């Protein structure tokens, strides 16, 4: 299960959408897909300045998946059909958030000799193949290049999964504006918090799920690394062990704060995770009741 509160307009920006006009004017339909659930959120757009988007519906449909699967369970597609059928042809801005379980992330170092689009595509594919040789998937790769000399942040999603999603949504005349892994939304929300609270662009951005963490290191606006690691109920201990090792290898990262969604923090505080500083990222819209445990985020 992905654990965080949705933050429309912050974790998914208009600029990220392939359907920017719907993102500006239509209500949002958010589909959060994990191995064990399909969560469906509907948000009414706020038209007046200072008003917040209103959540008008939330449903959770249990799925029989495994945390080891590289694709969602087959039961997802019938469940998705049942959810979308009553909405067919209606005007929505559709946002699909996928568990990090189905994504692969990689921070590739700057290579001055890699210039053409063909060279970049080959470099990205080679990097992913080297890092994830055993997955055996046909991946759709998205790259977020940094500025000169900075790393390129890659994410890859199974092409078969994206194709089935497109077909399912097209069948109900609900074209997607955004399809993204959950960590992307976590990063967007953390970056927004950095700007609002006057933090520099430095920190560990953590996306927590029931069975694993996705952890990325940002220093001076450069995504230096990103990795996924399995966890259980003792996830805070696992995270602290990881960061302690990083302190030894990279002492300059010792003082970086940890950015966690308030829903994900699970009681993690600077006091309970000493010597690390924890920044609880809260929804800018005030969304987030304890009963909601959800997945989302974004990247600059």
Give the positions of each predicted feature.
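Hydrophobic/aromatic-enriched cytosolic interaction surfaces used to assemble or bind macromolecules
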Residues: 1-300
């Amino acid at each position: 299960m992905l654990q965080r509160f949705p933050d429309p307009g912050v974790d998914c920006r208009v600029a990220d959408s392939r359907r920017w006009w719907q993102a500006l004017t239509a209500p949002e339909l958010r589909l959060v897909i994990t191995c064990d659930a399909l969560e469906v959120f509907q948000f009414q757009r706020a038209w007046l300045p200072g008003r917040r988007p209103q959540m008008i519906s939330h449903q959770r449909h249990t799925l029989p998946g495994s945390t080891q699967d590289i694709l969602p369970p087959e039961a997802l597609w019938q469940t998705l059909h049942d959810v979308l059928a009553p909405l067919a042809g209606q005007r929505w801005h559709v946002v699909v958030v996928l568990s990090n379980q189905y994504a692969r992330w990689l921070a590739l170092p700057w290579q001055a000799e890699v210039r053409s689009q063909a060279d970049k595509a080959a470099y990205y594919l080679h990097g992913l193949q080297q890092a994830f040789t055993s997955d055996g998937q046909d991946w759709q790769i998205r790259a977020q290049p940094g500025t000169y000399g900075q790393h390129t942040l890659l994410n890859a999603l199974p092409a078969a999964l994206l194709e089935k999603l497109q077909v399912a949504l097209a069948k109900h005349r609900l074209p997607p504006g955004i399809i993204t892994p959950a960590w992307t939304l976590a990063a967007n929300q953390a970056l927004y918090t950095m700007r609002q609270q006057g933090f520099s662009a430095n920190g560990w951005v953590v996306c927590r799920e029931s069975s694993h963490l996705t952890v990325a290191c940002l220093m001076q606006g450069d995504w230096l690394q990103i990795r996924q690691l399995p966890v259980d109920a003792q996830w805070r201990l696992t995270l602290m062990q990881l960061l302690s090792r990083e302190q030894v290898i990279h002492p300059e990262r010792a003082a970086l704060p940890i950015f966690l969604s308030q829903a994900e923090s699970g009681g993690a505080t600077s006091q309970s995770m000493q010597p690390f500083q924890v920044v609880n990222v809260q929804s800018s819209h005030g969304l987030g009741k304890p009963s909601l445990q959800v997945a989302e985020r974004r990247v600059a």
